[in-house]
Amino acid sequence: MSRILTFNAGSSTIKLGVFESAASEEVRPLAGGVLDLRVSPLELKFNHDGSRETIELDAAVSDDLGDVIDALLAWLEAKFEGEAFSAAGHRIVHGGLHFDAPVWLDEAIIDRLDELSPLAPLHQPAGLKLVRAMQRARPRLPQVACFDTAFHRTQAPLVTRMAIPRALHEEGVRRYGFHGLSYESIADTLRNEEPALLAKKLVVAHLGSGASLCAMEGGVSRDTSMGFSALDGIPMATRPGELDAGVPLYLQQQRGMSVDELQQWLYHECGLKGVSGISADARVLLESDAPEAREAIALFCFRTARDATLGMPRLIIPSLQVNMRAGEVPTDKDGRPMLKVPLNGL
């Protein structure tokens, strides 16, 4: 029996999973948790065997995450009776042109992935920082990277191209798409539980702080709303989604914004937060009576419906057959989604 750790590193949280496998069995989930790096002492919310517990870890958050990973691994190994883990898997957002499948990580590959950090500045550095922290803490532990962009490599060349000079496209300035591990998980679930549904043409939505749509056919990606970066597509918590390229030019030329200020604005000041002026949290906006909050939610729903019905499907999906959700969508006390996207309203 072997146990595998999985990580999804963000700028303020680390999501982790523990999986178990035997030679004759499929890998099965054993436990999971979220480590919040924003509070002191650190809080690990952990689910195992149907029970939930909150653990305080005595570790300081440093730039290299060294103390955090040491404390986390010590607690996990004690929790599972001192048994060492056999491998660690990481969600790495961007695989660029060269990585279209999971890959064993070594220094050379980590350095190549770090070169992609400007394309995913919120996610790539955080993921690689955790990889390096694990390397220092457990240098002999094999580590694997799984890429969000890899799922979308099945798209036709025309879908990945933008109307820019060919030389830039060949250098890698093209549409990649993201949230691929989420979409791959949905496809795998359908393959096991609803194979007839998987064979159809679907539009799937990943709705969380980051949000996107994916057009699938036979369980593979044919188009997606995100493109070159995780800024594109439908509106998000703090990101604008699709935006006329003239807007950043205007802000730079007429308002004097620097490149760093533009990046901060695009990644942290737009979306639900920017439209409402109240919050990036859809739950807060749904409970608010402010007209700005209602407008932010209405815009999100309109743009999502527009892209799901008039965007991707117009090229590859003649009739929209099903809409599925992944991610963290606010629900009411009965578990029903509180964000209702009027797909048939257009």
Feature annotation, model-predicted:
Residues I4-T6, A87-G89, V144, L202-H206:
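Short glycine-aspartate micro-motif
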Residues I317-L346:
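Structural signal for terminal/edge beta-strands and the immediately following C-terminal loop/tail
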Residues A74-S86, L190-A196, A308-P318:
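Phosphate/pyrophosphate-binding loops at sites that engage ATP/ADP/AMP, CoA/4′-phosphopantetheine
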Residues W75-H123, P142-V144, A150-R161:
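Short beta-strand-loop/turn "lid" adjacent to the catalytic site in phosphate-handling enzymes
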Residues Q264, H268-G311:
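Adenine-nucleotide phosphate-binding core of ATP-dependent small-molecule kinases
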Residues D244-V247, L251-I278:
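Oxyanion-binding "anion nests"
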Residues I4, T13-S62, G227:
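Short glycine-rich, Thr/Ser-proximal phosphate-binding strand/loop in the N-terminal lobe
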Residues F151-Q254:
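Glycine-rich phosphate-binding loop of actin/hexokinase-like ATP-binding domains
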